[in-house]
A protein has these predicted regions:
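C-terminal substrate-binding subdomain of Rossmann-fold SDR/epimerase-dehydratase oxidoreductases
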Residues: 3-124
Length: 124
């Protein structure tokens, strides 16, 4: 939305936290589980995360920083609503995976990679 319209409103106040995971890291985690964890059954819950909680406000700040770097400053305005989707529920990461795998892409690098692809799409 920032490429097309500039400033925009967040759906919530941004205080809620999530554990984000770069898609390539998720794929590597799934491959690692398939190769190493023979006790895993299809009905077992699987929670793969970055093991690091980040607020939506922090994500917005990183995105604004990417726009600033291309000379297109935007403002992301927090909404008034509180989180009504997950209501601050947590999915606990399965720590057994840490024996074989840890995410390789931090939040800033992941956002930058996606942003770089979007820049191409929007002609920046």
């Amino acid at each position: 939305k920032g490429f097309e319209e500039g400033d925009f409103e967040m759906m919530t106040d941004g205080t809620e936290e999530r554990q984000f995971l770069y898609a390539e890291d998720c794929c590597e985690a799934l491959e690692t589980i398939m190769e190493n964890y023979t006790d895993f059954k299809p009905e077992d819950p699987l929670h793969i995360t970055s093991f690091h909680a980040t607020s939506i406000k922090e994500v917005a700040a990183i995105i604004m920083g990417q726009f600033n770097l291309i000379g297109k400053p935007i403002k992301i305005n927090p909404g008034l609503a509180k989180d009504s989707v997950q209501m601050d529920k947590r999915n606990e990461a399965n720590s057994y995976i840490m024996d074989w795998w840890l995410p390789q892409t931090n939040m800033q690098d992941g956002i930058k990679a996606v942003f770089d692809e979007m820049k191409k799409e929007y002609g920046y």
